[in-house]
Amino acid sequence: MADAATISKLEEGFKKLQGATDCKSLLKKYLTKDVFDQLKAKKTSLGATLLDVIQSGVENLDSGVGVYAPDAEAYTLFAPLFDPIIEDYHKGFKQTDKHPNKDFGDVNQFVNVDPDGKFVISTRVRCGRSMEGYPFNPCLTEAQYKEMEAKVFSTLSSLEGELKGSFYPLTGMAKDVQQKLIDDHFLFKEGDRFLQAANACRYWPSGRGIYHNDNKTFLVWCNEEDHLRIISMQMGGDLGQVYRRLVSAVNEIEKRVPFSHHDRLGFLTFCPTNLGTTVRASVHIKLPKLAANREKLEEVAGKYSLQVRGTRGEHTEAEGGIYDISNKRRMGLTEFQAVKEMQDGILELIKIEKEMQ
């Protein structure tokens, strides 16, 4: 049972949400009085309550989603809130649906989407993973953060070939190393206000670290938003190469570290928007003609379930007509299908851009 102080904070938060008429978050949409009353006293075995789930969305009324999972059990215990939000965000992943088993498919189906190098500046594919036996950020102790970092360090240190590299803990990082990682756009900063409010940044920078290979095409973030973010990237449009590198890395890491997986929801992550495959395949792409015709851009993006963001990711503008375009769907389809959909969409956008020139 949640304690009285928590429940009174929850009542306050619920009232604030109800009163916020211009709040458009999925939290507000699905946290009805019935659902609220059903869940407000519940507590996971690690001690997480509904407050941990909703506090970021209560504090930041401009959130798109507004909920985070404090631990794996939260997805089950607070399902009356999570399930409809997941269904809404993941476009029809119904509460009776089951996410398919992991399937990276035939990695040779992926190509260089821009062999002439005219449009695509860089290509990146990432996935998130949570380590089994540990809660997500809000419930982690400092000792757990450090223990996880040590496990990740020893796992990554044994990688060989193209994936071989170095691990840099954020704690006690030398200024010159820090600057170098910032210049390479590798260093992650302490979480934004959405993550801060979700208590995702406690004991910072304890237990946080960055690994990258010698070519700087493979990167692992340890304990940023998720326990692990595994990233493969390079300049240009060779999606095939980027995808193959990611798949071999994930397979290698998985041999040594068991990941949290849910029968229905797939791989578990802190934010419900990343569940399932957890895969985000993206390009930084110059589309000057389509940039001037935003409606057409959005129409094609919609057809292939692509998400169009500004150059520096979420909540940013496109600088010089350069967009960050990625697959939007992560659930109810395989890893292969998610990336294939993105490849098809990017090829189509490039074709249209060429026709408009």
From Swiss-Prot:
Modified residues annotated as N-acetylalanine in this record: 2
Keyword Nucleotide-binding: yes
Enzyme type, top EC level: transferase
EC number(s) on file: 2.7.3.3
Record-level GO cellular component terms: extracellular space
Record keywords, A-Z: Acetylation, ATP-binding, Kinase, Nucleotide-binding, Transferase
PROSITE patterns, per the entry: PHOSPHAGEN_KINASE, PHOSPHAGEN_KINASE_C, PHOSPHAGEN_KINASE_N
Chain positions recorded as ATP binding sites: 122-126, 185, 229, 280-284, 309-314
Reactions catalysed, as given in the entry: L-arginine + ATP = N(omega)-phospho-L-arginine + ADP + H(+)
GO molecular function (one): ATP binding
Domain Phosphagen kinase N-terminal: residue ranges: 9-91
Coiled coil: none
PANTHER family: ARGININE KINASE 1-RELATED, ARGININE OR CREATINE KINASE
Protein name (Swiss-Prot/TrEMBL): Arginine kinase
Lineage, top ranks: Eukaryota, Metazoa, Ecdysozoa, Arthropoda, Crustacea
